[in-house]
Amino acid sequence: MLRLYEDWRGCAPQSVEQLPGAGSNRTYYRFRDAEGNSLIGVVGTSREENEAFIYLARHFGQKRLPMPRVVAVSTSRLCYLQTDLGHRSLFDALSEGREKGGRYAHEEKELLRRTIAELPRIQFVGAEGLDFGRCYPMASMDRTAVFFDLNYFKYCFLKTTGLDFNEVKLEKAFSEMAKDLVGDPDRHAFQYRDFQARNVMLDRDGQPRFIDFQGGRRGPVEYDVASFLWQASVHYAPELRHELMATYLDAARLYTDVDTG
């Protein structure tokens, strides 16, 4: 990773900082030069995953979407340098509201509105001209992928609560949900897949920038909305969820017909 930076920059960095893990097998570093300019170095263990991110980042850059740019890639394809989108995540910015059990201040709600208002542009503009065959680990959200998520919920959450439930009825409900989610593929767009507050960085003006989209694929856009509004630990009140949903739908109308019935 250090060699890649030196080859690209022409000199050694002034400082190197390893960043906290992000729940994946990738390792992140922040490189700074003598002028204080920074880049993020990424070391991954999967070439296929790296290739997906590199392709998506370049595609989104062509679409002028608020994502990082990849500026250098190692010959092994296991390391790359990307632009640094800041130190503060949306998750960090919402800490006070979380600590108050979901009683978010006006400024925090405004950050949430700005973030979810950007989602339709990523989904629909991002899908234009995108070669989904280059996505990883799959090109589109199919029934198998839906059941993977549903079973993760069943075994890693529901069964750990000790609640009694009818597994047969649950499987039937899962089947109906999978059918609804897969739905009409012609209405699918880019599915971010992991659209949550930890993957949103805020620039100096408080504008959202988006990272960690390497698992994106073609899929139902509703998935990302649910991921954001019902993400663990944020404690959004029903009224706030309704408000953010309305913000998303208003933004989505620029790109697609919206049925709120």
Per-range role (PLM):
Residues P20, Y29-F148, Y152, K159:
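ATP-binding pocket architecture of kinase catalytic cores
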Residues C11-Y29:
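ATP-binding glycine-rich phosphate-binding loop
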Residues G129, Y136, S140-R143, F147, ...:
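Glycan-recognition and catalytic cores of secretory/periplasmic carbohydrate-active enzymes
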Residues N151-T160, E222-V258:
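Active-site activation/catalytic loop segments of kinase-like enzymes and analogous catalytic loops
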Residues N25-R32, I122, M177-Y223, H235-Y236:
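Active-site acidic catalytic loop and adjacent metal/ATP-binding pocket
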Residues T27, L39-I40, P66, Y80, ...:
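Protein kinase-like catalytic core scaffold
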Residues M1, Y5-W8, A127-A139, T144, ...:
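An alpha-helical support segment within catalytic cores of ATP-dependent transferases
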Residues Y5-Q14, K63-L65:
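Short secondary-structure junctions
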